[in-house]
């Protein structure tokens, strides 16, 4: 069975990683008991706004699907600096849809208009770092108040279907969409600083909702495997087939 393990031991990090991986199917539809909204699809997102070197684009009503296939590659929880680092990949595709408004010149071709978009990323990866500080809650328990979040995405292989540039001329509209898909890798790469900042903001907001709902000690007990803390926080999580004994001291 699971025994207590020092939080500074390598087992602690393995337990956190295993727990988070097993929690992902639950997170897909949301876990209200810990303040976690559904992530597949991921909705209710702020607009993505990019304006640099004559390339203006705004993405509204963004919805992202495919995140329930996320694989957690590595997790590091530093309970001294209150820093959490997560590295993950999504085998297959994640797909973002919404409404784009663009005013740009790409490879000498002017593109201006507004309409629906679909962007798919094949085998993307993401690194997220959350940093905070313990804060007293209204019930006398200690909660983690996040002070910063950063994210870095490696978009894998992007493809795009974008409409709204020539809505009155279907052949031109089809040509513009085909062109957008061809240049999608370069365009997404140019958007990367904006996407990283946006993803960091989303991670901060979504993670803070959890850390404001579940006390710091319940999530990461000092001498209790992190997974046990998650079991306490999420009713019914103990039914998931998590082989914790493989990672704990006996």
Swiss-Prot record:
<dbReference type="InterPro" id="IPR010562">
    <property type="entry name" value="Haemolymph_juvenile_hormone-bd"/>
</dbReference>
<dbReference type="InterPro" id="IPR038606">
    <property type="entry name" value="To_sf"/>
</dbReference>
<comment type="function">
    <text>Has beta-carotene-binding activity. May be involved in the transport of carotenes from internal tissues to epidermis and cuticle of the locust.</text>
</comment>
<protein>
    <recommendedName>
        <fullName>Putative beta-carotene-binding protein</fullName>
    </recommendedName>
</protein>
<dbReference type="Pfam" id="PF06585">
    <property type="entry name" value="JHBP"/>
</dbReference>
<dbReference type="GO" id="GO:0005615">
    <property type="term" value="C:extracellular space"/>
</dbReference>
<keyword id="KW-0813">Transport</keyword>
